[in-house]
């Protein structure tokens, strides 16, 4: 036999050497359950687990339902802030229409102020203009070429802007309509 087999592990030596542990183990009666008691205990555990499962399932469904409601509310009211910024622009336009001023210069100044209000509302709504300068390189992600015209400019550069484009939070809402220079 080897040395390991002859010597018991230290834990076993301590338990065997301690007479109080042996007496305590001998004095406690072994709790023996009848099969009916074990079945009853297991059925109780099954009932508790089923109850916990149903509660967790209901909680998950409630969380999902609340998330769907929150998303619906977010979609419904997402434009509210932007709309609040447009109300003063509408007020200015109604005021301009209600005046009988025959002065074209004053009317133009009023329109310029209203345009500034509108651009301010766009900025607050994270909406920016796409207005390429003449000679800028054509960008198909932000520009839509309507025509290709002969020009002294480099090929595929903007010759004119027919309609400004817009982005909302770096997403193109409408590309700028441009004419581009034709290749030579």
UniProtKB/Swiss-Prot annotation:
- Compartments reported by the entry: Cytoplasm
Q: Which residues cross the membrane?
A: none
One cellular component (GO) term of this entry: cytosol
GO biological process terms held by the UniProt record: protein folding
Q: Which Gene3D superfamilies match?
A: 3.90.20.20, Head domain of nucleotide exchange factor GrpE
Q: Which InterPro entries match?
A: GrpE, GrpE_coiled_coil, GrpE_head
The similarity comment for this entry is: Belongs to the GrpE family.
**How does the annotation summarize its subunit structure?**
Homodimer.
Q: What does this protein do?
A: Participates actively in the response to hyperosmotic and heat shock by preventing the aggregation of stress-denatured proteins, in association with DnaK and GrpE. It is the nucleotide exchange factor for DnaK and may function as a thermosensor. Unfolded proteins bind initially to DnaJ; upon interaction with the DnaJ-bound protein, DnaK hydrolyzes its bound ATP, resulting in the formation of a stable complex. GrpE releases ADP from DnaK; ATP binding to DnaK triggers the release of the substrate protein, thus completing the reaction cycle.
Task: Tell me the protein's name.
Answer: Protein GrpE
